[in-house]
């Protein structure tokens, strides 16, 4: 009997969260009790973008700083990651790489009208998948393109056809391609109001018809355009991973995590409703060890960890 697609995607979500389990600390008894009052406690694993770790020293030193700040993983950039040095940093720090972020996807796009550019985008995506697998990661974050590359139906068709060619490799390696919702004028109205839904994103992901393509939903990026709790409910099991930052509709500007006016109470409720277990990645300015500790605590407060 075939396993439903969303069940397979949920398995990937859990594998992403627990695949580096040997390197993750055991939950304390306190965390167990905390989960009684807050169902997300013990179910979210904090990670951060590598570029946020702004301290001097080796890659190992940077990993150790992230761990000391309270993070349980690091997202590296790929292509461009030094596999050997990253493995060394993981080994010496005890901190896993849970996934990667595409380093070229804004410039070399799957939506490009130029066939050679799309071919290069595919080549780089496959390299990122291989790099991610080489360091034990389970997700490869992808910005699929830009709305400026053509009409909505054209760029959707181009990007889906192009990215789909990498899906067999993603399945072979056990690395999910996770689409991030960004301000790229795709699947939302950039000049629209705050009552927009995630329906277009859900449809886009479903067009791949694969559990190996899902969402890395950025909770801050589209608060300007819609209810993040409702977006989470709409996307459901398509959400393999989360990004987080703050945003203020009142000021129309970014904010620290938990500041601004994002309805985190509804976000927490929605994550519980879809039974989300997995990684949540900070995507903010970052800084030295003290700054990273502050960000980690902000995430704890926002998600009730």
PLM regions: where:
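Histidine-acidic metal/acid-base catalytic patches
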Residues: 2-47, 52, 56-70, 136-138, ...
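Active-site acidic/histidine proton-transfer and metal-coordination neighborhood
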Residues: 10, 14-24, 38-40, 111-217, ...
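Active-site-proximal loop/turn and secondary-structure-junction residues that shape catalytic pockets
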Residues: 52-54, 80-82, 103-106, 146-148, ...
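N-terminal substrate-binding region of glycoside hydrolase catalytic domains
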Residues: 65, 69-78, 104-105
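Anion (oxyanion) recognition and catalysis
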Residues: 67, 91, 133, 171, ...
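Glycine-rich, proline-tolerant flexible connector loops at the mouths of alpha/beta enzymes
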Residues: 77-92
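Metal-dependent catalytic neighborhoods of phosphoester/phosphodiester hydrolases
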Residues: 83-87, 152, 291-292
